[in-house]
Amino acid sequence: MASEDVTITVRLIRSFEHRNFRPVVYHGVHLDQTVKDFIVFLKQDIPLRASLPPPFRNYKYDKLKIVHQAHKSKTNELVLSLEDDDRLLLKEDSTLKAAGIASETEIAFFCEEDYKNYKANPISSW
C-alpha cells in the first residue's frame, strides 16, 4: 500500500496563559512516519520559516496533541483542550496514522512543561 500524503495544520502554542498561538499548514505529510520523526521535522522546519515571528521560531516545542479532526466536533477551548490526554496526546513511537491523524487534522505543538503548568492552574491573562 502506498503511503498517504495529507494536509495537516500545526498550531504552534507559544503561551497558554496569553492564548498566543500561530497556525502553520503542512501539505504532503506522510502518515506512515512516526510521531518522533514528525517532531524532528517540525523542529528543523519551524526555525527556517521567515513568516513566523522570532518568538515562535525559537521556542522549545516538544509535544503534539490533536486539537481537531475533520468532520468531528470542536471543543470550546480557545487554545487547546485540557481533556482526553490519554487519547489525544501523540505517543512518539506510533505512526501518525495509528495516532489518529488524517487529512485536515489540526494538531498542537507545544512545550509539555508549559502545558502541565497551565493544566494545573488554567488561568488566562486576558
Curated annotation (Swiss-Prot):
Pfam short name (any one): DUF2340
Domain of life: Eukaryota
Protein family membership: Belongs to the UPF0538 family.
Descriptive protein name: UPF0538 protein C2orf76 homolog
Organism annotation: Bos taurus
